[in-house]
């Protein structure tokens, strides 16, 4: 049975014409969006057709970016040291910073549209995307200046994005020492994690403690990466005006704090009941 992932449904390879053509299409789309954004914010009137065009451009660009990113990320999920995957990951990150100023301008323009409900009601396209438009308006209060947004986006490539790649690389290449049938073996972390579902209780126990012990090999590197990411999050949260990183996460997750508290309380009750059952057994 074939156990390797097939990504040919997305692209045949990084060197394929399909992948290269979409990269070129991305460059053209970015250039076009940047030019169009300047025209939109400088010219008054025609709000409804402009907003419809924004939806059209945003949808097409998101679909294109999603396809490219999926191929890169899935390739690296299977092989974190894939040189082509790493190279194109950096290339994509760099390209995407080029649209930040334009998208910031457009989102701020949308947030300043007067009588937005009337504008939306006059278009079937806009009515279909009302939630998306209203969310842009709601989140606009956290926007920084066009230039600041661009700077943050570019610095993330050598900040949190780089730290995240380091953390993923350390974890994905981690080997776990575990005793199986009286023999010590060195296995990939993913293999040991899958042992959590093995019907043999003793093997599950060994796998758990072996996993925890293995993290000591990379704990300093992972801690440094997480601290770097956390530091950036704290800084950006403060700049944008969020009350805390949790507040930012709740906003981005479309969740209120009361819902989160209810979920956490339910989890605590469940784990408490489960622990009581284990003790009874």
Label every PLM stretch briefly.
Residues 270-273, 277-281:
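Single conserved hydrophobic/aromatic residue that forms the stacking wall/gate
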Residues 1-272:
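A well-structured
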